[in-house]
Every structure is written in C-alpha cells, then in structure tokens.
C-alpha cells in the first residue's frame, strides 16, 4: 500500500510510475477525490461536534439560571446536531471504505533502477552461471522420463483432482523431500535463516496485507464456510507473521525460511505449460523472507538473491539472473530478480525463483513498524524470494541429470539425503 499523503502530494509522479507498469492511472484521481470528500466530511463533523459541545455548556448555564425553556430549545437543537453528525459519520464510513479499497488496488512503485519496459520481452539479463549440458543422445522431457520410469503419474492425478496435478511415486517422491531438506539445511545453517512451518489456511486480513487481495482474488482457493484462503505462497504467511506489531531495531533483520505447499487456481494461464509439472495447482516451495530497514533493503535483495542462487550452484544447474522491467513487475514488488534454470525440454531458461524487494508496501498494509535509533516509528521493508520452487528444481534435475540408459543421476549434494547415486 502506498502512503496516502504521498499520493496526495505527488499525484503526477505516481501516475507516471503506473504508466511504466502498464496500469491505468484513473485510480489516482479517484483516490484523490475520495480523500478530498473524506477531509471535507471530517471538517463538517468536527465543526458540528464543537457546536454540540458548546451547546451542552450553554444548557448547563441556562439551567443554572432557571431558564429552562431556553435550555430546552438548545437541547432540541443538540438532538438535531447529533442526528446530522450520525448521518455524516455514515457517509464518512462509506467514503473511507471506498478510499481504502482503492488504495489496496494500487501496485507498488518501481524502484528507480528498474529497467523500463512493457512486458517480459524487455526484461534485462544480468548474468549467467554454468553452461547448458550438451547431450550425446536425445534428452527426454521430464513428463516422458518420469512416466517411463513409473515415477510420475499424471493420469491418476487427473482422476483424483483434475488437470494440473501430479502424483510423485517412489524415489522421485523421496527426491522431492530430499530437495526440501537440502534447501532448509542450506538456508538455516549457512545463510542464517529461522525455519518456519506456517499454516496453509489464512484469514482475509492476512492475505490482504501481503498484497494478494483484492487483485488476485480469482487466482486463490477459498473456503466458502469460514472465508479462509489457501496460501498461494509462504510469502503470505511470513508477511503476516508480525502484522500489527512493532519490532525493535536491534532485532532486524529478521530472516525466515519456510516450506509449504502452494495452491493456485492459475486462472489466467489457460493453455500455458499444459504438459508436465511446470505449472501446477499445487506445488512445493521453500520461501525466503526478510524484515529489515529502508537503509538496508536494497543490499538485502542482493543477498537474498545470492542465497537462492547458491541452491542452483550447489546442484550444478545452469541458470541466469534476469532483472524484471517495469511492465513485468509483480503487484507488490518495487524491484525483482528472476532466476531462470535451463530446461532441455524447452531448450530455454524457465523461472525457478523470483526475488523481490517490496520496500514498505507490505509493512504499511500489515501495519508492521520498527523503532529506529531515535526511537521513531517507521514501517519495515520486506523482501521475499523462492529458495527454490521445489517441483521445478526436481524437473531441472530430471532433465539435466538424465543418462543415456534412461536413468536419473542424483546430484552430489543430494546423495547423503537419498543414500544412492541413481534413480531408475
């Protein structure tokens, strides 16, 4: 959420930023209009309350002077004023509800260093690591390899749940768990994160504070009875962990790593990545999350991104880092790096992690503050990143580590977790 005062004082700057993101700018005019109406109503209510208070004092004075008839007239006026106040307060609530909703619909402002562009085609490649493997045989796509080895069952998953679900079997299911444990061990032991296992169901307030609502309502699974939401990412739970709290300066940065399944309706992705495990309604992810100060958040993004990269490096999976342009930024992000891993079946790089600095966007939505060295209250800056998407990491291993005789070699770092060197 953006600061209302900042919007009021810098409407043109905000509009220019929204234009760079390919967003409509009329919402800023609506916000300013609601804000002006709100301030006008507040002034009217304040004036009437002052008049009512003055009348109360006058009534007491008149009664002391035995002027009961005059006092009764003032009392009647007071009741009329109270009714006016009640009506204006009702109008004020409606205006404030509309204003707050509009504020929740405004995306974050891109950082000054973000490349300007319309869509993913104008993202900027920052660096590459590793070299795609040159096969001396025709590599198989993970969906074919997994089916032939009786490790992936798409048909029975569809029978159970419909499209975009997968059953993992045998050693490939164990490899999924090995990846999760490997990532958690790396981030806690080497990178200093605190491990969290959060709830998968959260309240509307929680998922609103992270930025998923109201914009992504159609992409979320929701319970009809209790109005609870299944998380689309552990970022939702971690961003709400300290909602309505004030953190001490010396406690920052707070660094959390969480493992959860993630649930997404993928409402806008019809026809995309229809085969295999790349785009699923349910998938496992290890999430990295920081709470820090405005002074440290830019450098924190570089550090968080390097932590996600380390997973790929230790697994010896070729990847590239891409800086997202303004038109491809996520709703809550001020700056984002995507990590894209090489997949032979696509003969291309595919996203496996998205690392973002949201600045005070989530802190303001969740009312999460900290006391600085001068004991002043400020909103925290938050950062998030996949460390990594487990299913896509599994896919990358299957495709990049496959052998000519149809087996899957296990990366060296995962052998201690698996107790074997090959699957198949």
Swiss-Prot record:
It catalyses: tRNA(Ser) + L-serine + ATP = L-seryl-tRNA(Ser) + AMP + diphosphate + H(+); tRNA(Sec) + L-serine + ATP = L-seryl-tRNA(Sec) + AMP + diphosphate + H(+). It is found in: Cytoplasm. GO terms for biological process: selenocysteine biosynthetic process; seryl-tRNA aminoacylation. InterPro entries: aa-tRNA-synt_IIb, aa-tRNA-synth_II, aa-tRNA-synth_II/BPL/LPL, Ser-tRNA-ligase_type_1, Ser-tRNA-synth_1_N, SerRS_1_N_sf, SerRS_core, tRNA-bd_arm. L-serine binds at residues 233-235, 287, 386. ATP binds at residues 264-266, 351-354. It holds the Pfam family Seryl_tRNA_N. The keyword Aminoacyl-tRNA synthetase applies. It is an enzyme of class 6 (ligase). GO terms for molecular function: ATP binding; serine-tRNA ligase activity. GO terms for cellular component: cytoplasm. Keywords: Aminoacyl-tRNA synthetase, ATP-binding, Cytoplasm, Ligase, Nucleotide-binding, Protein biosynthesis. Pathway: Aminoacyl-tRNA biosynthesis; selenocysteinyl-tRNA(Sec) biosynthesis; L-seryl-tRNA(Sec) from L-serine and tRNA(Sec): step 1/1. The keyword Ribosomal protein does not apply. Its EC number is 6.1.1.11. SUPFAM superfamilies: Class II aaRS and biotin synthetases, tRNA-binding arm. Catalyzes the attachment of serine to tRNA(Ser). Is also able to aminoacylate tRNA(Sec) with serine, to form the misacylated tRNA L-seryl-tRNA(Sec), which will be further converted into selenocysteinyl-tRNA(Sec). Belongs to the class-II aminoacyl-tRNA synthetase family. Type-1 seryl-tRNA synthetase subfamily. Consists of two distinct domains, a catalytic core and a N-terminal extension that is involved in tRNA binding. Homodimer. The tRNA molecule binds across the dimer. This is Serine--tRNA ligase. It comes from Petrotoga mobilis (strain DSM 10674 / SJ95). The gene is serS.
């Amino acid at each position: 959420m953006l600061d209302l005062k900042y919007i009021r004082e810098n409407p043109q700057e905000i509009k220019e930023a929204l234009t760079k993101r390919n967003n409509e700018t009329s919402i800023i005019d609506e916000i300013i209009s609601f804000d002006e109406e709100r301030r006008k109503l507040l002034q009217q209510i304040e004036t009437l309350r002052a008049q009512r208070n003055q009348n109360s004092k006058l009534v007491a004075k008149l009664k002391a002077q035995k002027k009961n008839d005059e006092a009764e007239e003032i009392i009647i006026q007071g009741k009329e004023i109270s009714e006016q106040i009640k009506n204006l307060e009702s109008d004020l609530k409606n205006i404030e509800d509309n204003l707050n909703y509009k504020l929740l619909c405004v995306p974050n402002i891109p950082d000054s260093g973000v490349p300007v562009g319309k869509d993913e085609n104008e993202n900027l490649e920052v660096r590459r690591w590793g070299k795609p493997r040159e096969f001396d045989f025709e590599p198989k796509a993970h969906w074919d390899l997994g089916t032939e080895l009786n490790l992936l069952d798409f048909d029975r998953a569809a029978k159970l749940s419909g499209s975009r679900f997968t059953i993992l079997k045998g050693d490939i299911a164990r490899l999924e768990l090995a990846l999760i444990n490997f990532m958690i061990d790396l981030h806690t032991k080497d990178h200093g994160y605190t491990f969290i296992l959060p709830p998968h169901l959260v309240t509307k307030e929680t998922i609103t504070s992270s930025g998923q609502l109201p914009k992504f309502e159609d992409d979320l699974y929701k319970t009809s009875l209790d109005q609870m939401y299944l998380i689309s990412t552990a970022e939702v739970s971690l961003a709400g962990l300290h909602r309505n709290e004030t953190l001490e300066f010396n406690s920052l940065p707070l660094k959390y790593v969480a493992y959860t399944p993630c649930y997404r309706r993928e409402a806008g992705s019809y026809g995309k990545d229809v085969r295999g495990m790349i785009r699923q309604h349910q998938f496992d992810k290890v999430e990295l999350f920081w709470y820090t100060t405005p002074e440290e958040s830019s450098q924190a993004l570089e550090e968080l991104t390097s932590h996600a990269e380390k997973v790929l490096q230790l697994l010896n999976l070729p990847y590239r880092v891409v800086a997202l342009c303004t038109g491809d930024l996520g709703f809550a992000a001020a700056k984002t790096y995507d990590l894209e891993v090489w997949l032979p079946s696509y003969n291309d790089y595919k996203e496996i992690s998205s690392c973002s600095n949201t600045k005070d966007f989530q802190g303001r939505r969740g009312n999460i503050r900290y006391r600085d060295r001068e004991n002043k209250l400020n909103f925290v800056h938050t950062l998030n990143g996949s460390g990594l998407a487990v299913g896509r990491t599994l896919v990358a291993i299957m495709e990049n580590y496959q052998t000519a005789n149809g087996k899957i070699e296990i990366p060296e770092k995962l052998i201690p977790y698996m107790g074997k060197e090959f699957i198949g």
